Each structure stands twice: as structure tokens, then as C-alpha cells.
Amino acid sequence: MTGYALNVLALCAAVGATAGAFAIPRIADMLLSRAYLRSYTWWYRCLDDFAHYRDVCPDRLPRQNEKGTAGAVGIWLADCRSQALKGALTHERAEALREAGIDVGKGASTRSEVEQQRRCSFSPWPWQRAVLAAAMALWFAAQPLFGVPWHQGALLCVCGVAMASGVVCDLRARMIPLECCAALLVAGGAYQLLRHGSAGIAEGAVAAAAVLAVCWTANRIARKSGESVGFGDIRCVTALAFACGPATLLGAAACYVSACAFSLAGMLAHRLGRRDGIPMAPFLSIWLAVGTTVLG
């Protein structure tokens, strides 16, 4: 490797480390705050719409397949029930649902609204900055190391920043913000266009549609058990499928094999139960790495 190539690698690593240590914590904190406010506003607006719906139709509940506001409230109601089964509602929201006549059980909530809002912020410890800096230094340096042209590598770096921000948010508050998924979709689509042309866009669209179909089917099967795929995860895997195109299958396999191995290790160590969920964003980042830099 020539001195010029080493200088390029060092520069990319330095830029990545700076982004990881300083930009990503700030981005994650901002996105968490925005996501909480958006979720809070949407949730209580849907609660009001639900009350209005029951006034008009007292003998039935809204369904997801209905049109307009009723369908949106049906989606909200299904999400509330799923969150209640996981014990992920706040005390205030669980009580509001009970007052509205929706039975969510006794173990539907585990924290107050104030605690949830506190979770939707991120002030990193020094070791967390160091981990983010190291991860992003490796990601940025991997682009020239794998021979990715600079303009394609720049797009993958944007994908990496978006994915890392999503990982922080998921670990902190079990959510992957919409903005992270949108950045993955746009930058990943541009990467596919530059690398594979219009065929890459078509393959990415087919992969995204297939992933959406799988998630929809899985949620139809598992919605009564509370083990359905979350909306944030669905948005993220759809964006990843579009970004990875033909490498989606291998990227997804690497992601879920890693997640299964982690869960199995946790159960063997008695740190996880059979029904315990785990944040998926760290494993989705493996999907991005395998599906773009390694195999894309």
C-alpha cells in the first residue's frame, strides 16, 4: 500500500472518528427529542379520534383496513395493544386507554411519561464517544480500503452516520427515528443508482417490496402475541433492502443470524428470557455493512 493510500485511509478514519465522537451524539439527541414530541402528539390525537369514533359507532372498534381517520386509529389501537403486551406503555397512557374503555391488562406499563421523555435524550459518557468514534473510523476507512469510488463512498458514509444514529436511539429508547430511515433510503438509493444504474434501483425496489411483504405477513401472524415487528424496524429494514438491492438476502441473513446468536447467548447466561425483546438496530447495521461494502 502506497503512502498516498495510507494518507487517504488515515484522513477517512479521522473524519469518521470526529463524526462518531461529536456529530452522532448530537444528531441522536436531537432525533430522540423530535421523535418523542412527534409520538406524544400523534398518540393523544389518535386517542381523541378514538373517542370521537366510539361516540359515532359505540358498538364497534376501528380497524386498520378502514379508510381515512378510522384506519389510522385502527393502526394506533393495534400498536397500543402490542405495546401493552410488551409492557412498553407509560403509566399515563395505560390509564388513558383504560378510561377510554380499552382493556390493556395490569402489566401494560413500566415507566412514567417523565421517565420516557428522559430516555428520549442522549448525553454520552466518554466511553460511548470512544466506541462511536472507533466504529465510524472503521466505517469511513473501509470505503477506500474496499476500493469504493469516492462519490459512492461518500453516500455510504452518510448511510453509516444515519445507521449509527439509529443504533444510539434504539439502544437508548427502543426507537429508530423516521429521519434515520429516510436518510438511509435516499443515500442508499443514490448509492445503488451510481453503482448499478437503473437496474440497481429496480432491484432495490423489488427487495424493499419483498421485505415489506414479509413484515406484513409476520405482523398478521404474530399481532396477538405482542411479538410483531415495530414500525421503526419495518421502516429501517425497508430502507436497508432498497440500499442493498441484490445483496439484501445475504445482508438480512447476517443480521438475523447475529441477532439469534446474541439472544441465545443471553438466554444461556440467564440475562434474557424467551419473550424478551432486544434492540434490532445494532444488528441491522451488520445488514448495512454486509449488503453494501462487502457484497454490494
Please provide the spans of the model-predicted regions.
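IQ-motif-like calmodulin-binding regions
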Residues: 37-112
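A membrane-topology feature that recognizes alpha-helical transmembrane segments
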Residues: 1-52, 57, 108-296
